[in-house]
From Swiss-Prot:
HAMAP family: ProA. The lineage of its organism: Bacteria, Bacillati, Cyanobacteriota, Cyanophyceae, Synechococcales. Pathway: Amino-acid biosynthesis; L-proline biosynthesis; L-glutamate 5-semialdehyde from L-glutamate: step 2/2. Its EC number is 1.2.1.41. It catalyses: L-glutamate 5-semialdehyde + phosphate + NADP(+) = L-glutamyl 5-phosphate + NADPH + H(+). The keyword NADP applies. The gene is proA1. One of its GO terms (cellular component) is cytoplasm. It comes from the Bacteria. Keywords: Amino-acid biosynthesis, Cytoplasm, NADP, Oxidoreductase, Proline biosynthesis. Its main location: cytoplasm. This is Gamma-glutamyl phosphate reductase 1. Catalyzes the NADPH-dependent reduction of L-glutamate 5-phosphate into L-glutamate 5-semialdehyde and phosphate. The product spontaneously undergoes cyclization to form 1-pyrroline-5-carboxylate. Belongs to the gamma-glutamyl phosphate reductase family.
Length: 433
């Protein structure tokens, strides 16, 4: 049973996680992959127990009147669980990010410099209601040689407890310490976690923009921000209607609670009269409620859009629509109201598409495809710890590459710096190997 530690015990938990991380980072690829395989097998065997725990969470959340978008994130059905386990297996087969040499340079004869990939150490991950996030993050942490301290949303407490128990039990059968995966269960523990900069190397919050800002303002630990998902789709003057309709419907309705679902549709005025009526019909058949500017209201039946709609992440079957008079106007709107997440253009004009992709300031810019592809699993990362909308790397879906850093190794044979300084100093060769 996972028991939430008292605040005083959290230091002990973090210290033990640090020790587990040091050991984990020293293991070879095969040993870490065996641990990931054991996790996948354990999750598969425990599927009935996991789904039952999730049903308990869902029933309790429904009784409390939880919002529909949050409920949809909380729900872990059999299909989603199987897909998540498949993602764990994919992580097992990904290239090992540890030990990768990205610089190999001879400074002088017998003096060789290497830049080598290594783990960050201990991750603190605070995520929303999605229980599958715990599975994804745990597998990526093991693969990248990191320990992790997890805090899920209170709505998913039982699901997260059972998942952590299953994962720790699986790790106990391998050379990886079960203390590499840890779970916190109370909100009070978050503040103390944010103060454990002597143990925790990176905080990854997954939630609202306000929540991410709170984390950033209350910790000295580096934060990998994952904020709002206000995604846009722009239908250009040269858009193909046969592509525009299915892409728009998919981007809004395939999973409206996802952060990569579109919230605003921008339509060029040259095609608005032709495109909006069939689009509105297709979206209406999926139960989407539409909100439009004055021009949109003249063409289709919709509610009036307000200024607040352009900067709202609905996470629901609601879509705001605005008619624009140019590509430049669409780009300006996205850069003003977007969250730098993922935005797309539908157009047969490659020049317009290239301008859009160059000038839209987002982590993902797409041409003639759904924004729903903004996902670590779909990118071939196996899974993701989140999507970063900040400028500094990693950016976009964060997989293994975002969970490793590097160290410089210098191999010599009695070399000293004095040889290369002052009068008669010896020159470096700086020869890349």
């Amino acid at each position: 049973m996972v028991i939430s530690p008292s605040l005083s015990a959290l230091h002990t938990l973090a210290h033990n996680a640090r020790q587990a991380a040091l050991h984990l980072g020293s293991l070879n690829t095969a040993e870490r992959n065996q641990a990931i395989a054991a996790i996948a097998d354990g999750l598969t065997a425990a599927m009935p127990e996991i789904l039952a725990a999730n049903q308990e969470d869902c029933a309790a959340a429904e009784a409390m009147g939880i919002a529909k978008p949050l409920y949809n994130r909380l729900l872990l059905g059999e299909s989603k669980l199987k897909s998540t386990i498949a993602g764990v297996k994919d992580v097992e087969h990904l290239p090992d990010p540890l030990g990768q040499v990205t610089l190999h340079r001879q400074l002088d004869e017998g003096l060789v410099l290497k830049r080598v990939g290594c783990p960050l150490g201990v991750l603190g991950v605070i995520f929303e209601a999605r229980p599958e996030a715990l599975i994804q993050i745990s597998s990526l942490a093991i693969k990248s040689g990191n320990a992790v301290i997890l805090k899920g949303g209170r709505e998913a407490t039982r699901s997260c407890q059972v998942l952590t128990e299953v994962i720790q039990t699986a790790l106990a059968k391998t050379v990886v310490s079960p203390e590499a995966i840890n779970l916190l269960t109370t909100r009070e523990e978050i503040r103390e976690l944010l103060g454990l900069n002597q143990y925790v190397d990176l905080i990854i919050p997954r939630g609202s923009n306000e929540f991410v800002q709170y984390i950033q303002q209350n910790t000295q630990i580096p934060v990998l921000g994952h904020a709002d998902g206000i995604c846009h789709l722009y239908l250009d003057a040269q858009a193909d209607l046969s592509k525009a309709i299915p892409i728009t419907v998919d981007a809004k309705t395939q999973y409206p609670a996802a952060c990569n679902a579109i919230e605003t549709l921008l339509v060029h005025q040259a095609i608005a009269a032709e495109f909006l009526p069939p689009l509105a019909q297709a979206l209406g058949e999926k139960g989407v409620s539409l909100r439009g500017d004055s021009g949109t209201q003249k063409l289709i039946d919709c509610e009036p859009a307000t200024e607040a709609d352009w900067c709202t992440e609905y996470s629901d079957l609601i879509l705001s629509i605005k008619i624009v008079d140019s590509l430049e106007a669409a780009i300006d709107h996205i850069n003003q109201y977007g969250s730098k997440h993922t935005d797309g253009i539908i157009s047969e004009d490659l020049t317009a598409a290239e301008q859009f992709c160059q000038r839209v300031d987002s982590a993902g810019v797409y041409h003639n495809c759904s924004t729903r592809f903004a996902d670590g699993f779909r990118y071939g990362f196996g899974a993701e710890v989140g999507i970063s909308t900040q400028k500094m790397p990693p950016r976009g879906p964060v997989g293994l590459e975002g969970l490793v850093t590097y160290k410089y190794q210098l191999w010599g044979h009695g070399h000293i710096a004095a040889t290369y300084t002052g009068q008669g100093a010896k020159a470096f060769t700086h020869l890349d190997l």
